[in-house]
Amino acid sequence: MGAGITIDSDPIAEYEECQIKAAFLSSLPSGVGLFETIRFNAQEGIRRIAHYHEHLDRLSYSAKALRIPLDINAASALLEQSAMHLPTRSAYRVRLDLSRLGELSISSAVLDDLPSSVQVFWAHEILKGATHSLRMQSNNPLLLHKTTQRKVYDLAWQKAVSLGGFDALFINERGELTEGGRTSIFVRPHHSDEWLTPPLSAGVLPGVLRSSILRNPALKAREANLTIDDVIGANEIMLSNALRGMIKAHL
């Protein structure tokens, strides 16, 4: 267990950092795994796996961080093999799973179309009877990885769908906006040409499309701490994930 020690490092601080990291890894649930949900376009005879390298890079990074064995070449081959066997007539949702023991599996389904604008809810309002904590803990390291331990997220977006919406938004212990159950969120304030999205430090998954948007200067997007009021008062709301792209949304 290491902690990037340099000549100027404080040995006590470095030791404490190692203890924190060790506690995190040793407390991981035995069944926790990782997964990537990937868009596969197979229309008009053209096959393309969207954000292919970005998904594999994230999977590789998280597997290393969580000490989950991963054969990245096998993952790549499985993904490409699966894509080649899908009919070239639609867009598909392809899910690549990595178990705690390093076992790979894959599944796929046709991706349905969405309306031009989707409704989002607040998770704490639509899951009032939930036994899980609905406030994300920003210091939870697992939030930085797309793990299979996402029950409360899944409950939230599934409840939103049952109410005619698409997703539900979460806040953290400080009342800051974090993300949706299956999307990142961007808001554009009134009288501004910038898109704002919560920082990873709020307890946010580094979404593949989110990262791409932030890297593109033409989109004028940046990280900022946001509250419920910022969303309510926003001029525009946009959800994003690599599966669906950018999705116009409303409360």
Report residues per predicted region.
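Helix-start/capping segments and mature chain N-termini
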Residues: 1-93, 97-251
